[in-house]
């Protein structure tokens, strides 16, 4: 058998050499890429690269549109990619020190596009918080799974399903359960320690629904709570349930303390008409009802030919004489007009006989009012102290029937004998630069400034308004009082504010 000349098989050897050179060049390029990637990894060992497959899909339509070409590119180049992946595996066996095979050209290009779209290449910014991508352990587990085996193209096909699932969840449809996702991820070699967006979304939905339920509380519960708070809070600023006060007996109502937790709202009108009404006007007290009607309670007028200011108070607006049957009490001041005492219709102890002293018909002292000038001088607000009898265990007024000057309310207060008495004071007003006046918060019940406006409080509870009085028109005033005052006490205190005070004007 004769051998062929060399010229017959030389061309075949040339083709073989060219094919081997091409393969060698391709291997050299891939080896260079692998060494470059390893060098980059050694330079940045702590950097965790963004993973386009493991990163949670945002439910925005813009990101879904950006992810759509990724699926098409992978599907269109699946054949060549599979071939290059096999070559990468063979190259990984040649390089024993490699920890991660080089990504194929098409896959690398597509992953680079996805990474640039997820990090700094696009103007789109990721939200801080739980949508930061996968956590550290999940990403490291993916790197380990890719180093142990070939790159799985199925993870790209998964993105289309994940995108559809994300759009369904955003549209309010049924979301895939966390167990199915865990099974799929474990089947693909992804760590199960990854946090699921579905579970977090359920937590968000539950928290938002609970917040919505707390914001949209039933009106009945809110109203019940506000009613209880209004009943417990003594301040008239708190909303109170509308209560119609029934007045059967005027004299009994005028002497009965106000119910606890209820503010008695009244109105005082001043009548200056007539020959001497300018000097001695008549004052009428009416009860303001919730239905807008007014109920007459008391009337008072300053007596003529009296050494000191002396106001008679009656339950009959047409009979203001001391000897009448409607006479219920009086208000009397000292010579300077700074100290006032409120009495009922009892007998004066100085004019009473021995039998009268023992019969218990002596007059009671219901209140004492003391006015003083403020530290700012005569132009400042007046300082006001109110002394009333104390209350017993059954919320009844303690009877104080003094037989001499040493047993009066003013004497007890001046001697610091606070047994069986309650000391009240006016609330200090605040200077307002806008109105250039001293103001108090009357919660809409007083509309005009006046030196006669005041609020009575207790020193231990400044938020509890025992009584307030103020002007709303030329001859119209509002008067609101609370426990432990009665209508006669409050009306007499208001009358003391009308009277002129030589030492305080």
UniProtKB/Swiss-Prot annotation:
Record field: compositional bias (Acidic residues): 196-205
Gene Ontology MF, one: intraciliary transport particle A binding
Family: Belongs to the TUB family.
Ranges annotated as biased composition (Low complexity): 70-87, 206-220
Topological type in the membrane: Peripheral membrane protein
Domain of life, source organism: Eukaryota
Location(s), subcellular: Cytoplasm; Nucleus; Secreted; Cell membrane
Name of this chain's protein: Tubby protein homolog
Function text: Functions in signal transduction from heterotrimeric G protein-coupled receptors. Binds to membranes containing phosphatidylinositol 4,5-bisphosphate. Can bind DNA (in vitro). May contribute to the regulation of transcription in the nucleus. Could be involved in the hypothalamic regulation of body weight. Contribute to stimulation of phagocytosis of apoptotic retinal pigment epithelium (RPE) cells and macrophages.
């Amino acid at each position: 058998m004769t051998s062929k000349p060399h010229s017959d098989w030389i061309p075949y050897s040339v083709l073989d050499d060219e094919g081997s050179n091409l393969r060698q060049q391709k291997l050299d390029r891939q080896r260079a890429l692998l060494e470059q990637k390893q060098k980059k990894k050694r330079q940045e060992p702590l950097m965790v690269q963004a993973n386009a497959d493991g990163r949670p899909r945002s439910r925005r339509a813009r990101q879904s549109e950006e992810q759509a070409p990724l699926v098409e590119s992978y599907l269109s180049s699946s054949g060549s990619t599979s071939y290059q992946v096999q070559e990468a595996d063979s190259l990984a066996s040649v390089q024993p020190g490699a920890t991660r095979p080089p990504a194929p050209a098409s896959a690398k290009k597509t992953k680079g596009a996805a990474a640039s779209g997820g990090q700094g290449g696009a103007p789109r910014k990721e939200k801080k918080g739980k949508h930061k991508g996968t956590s550290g352990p999940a990403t490291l587990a993916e790197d380990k799974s890719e180093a142990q085996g070939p790159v799985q193209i199925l993870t790209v096909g998964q993105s289309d399903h994940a995108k559809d699932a994300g759009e369904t969840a955003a549209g309010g449809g049924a979301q895939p359960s966390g167990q199915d996702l865990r099974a799929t991820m474990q089947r693909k070699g992804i760590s199960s320690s990854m946090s699921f967006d579905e579970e977090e979304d359920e937590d968000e939905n539950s928290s938002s629904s609970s917040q919505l339920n707390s914001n949209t509380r039933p009106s009945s519960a809110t109203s019940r709570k506000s009613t209880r708070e209004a009943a417990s809070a003594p301040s008239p600023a708190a909303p109170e349930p509308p209560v119609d006060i029934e007045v059967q007996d005027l004299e009994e109502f005028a002497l009965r303390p106000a119910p606890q937790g209820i503010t008695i709202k009244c109105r005082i009108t001043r009548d200056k008409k007539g020959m001497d009404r300018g000097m001695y006007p008549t004052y009428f007290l009416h009860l303001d009802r919730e239905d807008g009607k007014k109920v007459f309670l008391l009337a008072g007028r300053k007596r003529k030919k009296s050494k000191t200011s002396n106001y008679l108070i009656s339950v009959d607006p047409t009979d203001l004489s001391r000897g009448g049957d409607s006479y219920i009490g009086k208000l009397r001041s000292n010579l300077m007009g700074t100290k006032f005492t409120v009495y009922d219709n009892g007998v004066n102890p100085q004019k009473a006989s021995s039998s009268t002293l023992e019969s218990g018909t002596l007059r009671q002292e219901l209140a004492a009012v003391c006015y003083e000038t403020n530290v700012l001088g005569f132009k400042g607000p007046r300082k006001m102290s109110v002394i009333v009898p104390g209350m017993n265990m059954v919320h009844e007024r303690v009877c104080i029937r003094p037989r001499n000057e040493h047993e009066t309310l003013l004497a007890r207060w001046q001697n610091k004998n606070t047994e069986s008495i309650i000391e009240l004071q006016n609330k200090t007003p605040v200077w307002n630069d806008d109105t250039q006046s001293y103001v108090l918060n009357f919660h809409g019940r007083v509309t005009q400034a006046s030196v006669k406006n005041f609020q009575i409080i207790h020193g231990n509870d400044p938020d509890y308004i025992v009584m307030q009085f103020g002007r709303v028109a030329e001859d119209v005033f509002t008067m609101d009082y609370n426990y432990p005052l009665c209508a006669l006490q409050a009306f007499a205190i208001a009358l003391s504010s009308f009277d002129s005070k030589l030492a305080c004007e």
